């Protein structure tokens, strides 16, 4: 197995995809302990093989882990960055908001992996020339780099999710070829939303407040035995593995007005639709309420799953049930397998899932990189 390190690991979507591609995680870092609870629950990492805390603290104590960091094949990371807009004229490295980005570069410099991946929002493309200069400043001329915007839907996955990737290596590999190979992968099927979620049990609206621990057949369960009907999509995300339990498929609370709106809106409609104008008479305030509600279309890919779902799922209304998507449905869209279990509170599940890299997109990237190792 090829050795990889995952920084800013979150709940483990990127790691899982790389593991499915043939990499083995030898070390992971995440500052958010609730996110990392899920990461650790789903894999067996020895205690000295992870660090829960700020990457800057990891860098300050890097000698403690040096034995683990020998001959690393791949380092992955998506450092949170807020200074990538065109409007920001400050140098990236001088912007205090980007200290985690700087820490990621420092880690690469210290570890010198054969390959690295940096993944981030598409706004990173606005500063790509400066970013590549930063890489050269930290890593010297031993590394070559390529970059690309990749959208999950272009690879047959049921989500419109565009992210920016930089791949670098010190083996002399032309990374342009890696991105070309990724883009030219033969797509066996292009999945849409109904493929991803329609085989899961139906849930009824939940209008009872303050009941996050309650579970039943109406609003769903944290964990329950379940016999899945055959689904080509489930077979795809589960890699053919048969799973006999359903996890994290639980409906959240909504007030009666929301539930009524969920039922009235047709698929593909938002808050401006005439079907709810008697409930939301805001014709002169369209710019405020346009993005308040949206009912997903079963025959299209899903809009981008985001961590905002931890607050509400009003922009992610199920196509034919008067409710928002459940965490398991969101995880399905992010191509997590059905036996990947999310820990913490239901709201926290949404945050974990929304911040993840789609597992099958990560696997696709990993399979191309591992060919050169």
PLM regions with names:
Residues 2-112, 122-126, 133:
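Core alpha/beta nucleotide-donor-binding catalytic domains of modification enzymes
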Residues 18, 139-140, 369:
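Hydrophobic alpha-helical packing residues
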Residues 42, 181-186, 319-323:
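Short Gly/aromatic-enriched secondary-structure transition segments
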Residues 55, 60-63, 149-153, 288-291:
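Short alpha-helical segments and helix-capping/turn motifs at coil-helix boundaries
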Residues 58, 84, 157, 181, ...:
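Short clusters of hydrophobic/aromatic residues that line enzyme substrate/ligand-binding pockets
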Residues 64-69, 82, 86-281:
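Class I S-adenosyl-L-methionine
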Residues 71-73, 162-164, 189, 193, ...:
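A generic secondary-structure signal marking the coil-to-beta-strand transition
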Residues 222-373:
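C-terminal target-recognition/interaction regions appended to catalytic cores
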